[in-house]
Amino acid sequence: MDEQKHHEELIKGISEQMKSVLGKSEQAIYIYLDDNHKVCNKKFADLLGYKSPKEWADADAPLSDVVEEDQQSVINAYTNASEKMVASDIEVRVKNVETDKIVKTRMIIAPVGHAGHVFTVHFFSKI
């Protein structure tokens, strides 16, 4: 199995594993393996103005929804989670692609293991 297919299977597997969390949480959530392999719940897609979770997952630039000044903080938190296994809690401003409105959020990012790989899970709450 090539890497692309393997990563597709991994994201499908963790989506199933986390299905109840994604569906029942009051928070906007996304799970990230890499730029091409990610999944979110409907609340996250709605927060950013996407028509569906699939539309967000198909977007190529994962940081394009984050205000430029906050992007480095998100990158640092991701690095801590994916490489050091350290969770972070940071303030992040995101942009709704439909309205261009800036939304202030608190993001909790934590590492999660699945099938021998480290994913990052991002929980967002408006502030």
Locations of regions flagged by a protein language model:
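PAS/LOV and related PAS-like sensory modules
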Residues: 9-34
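Short loop/turn microsegments at loop-to-beta-strand junctions
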Residues: 27, 90-91, 108
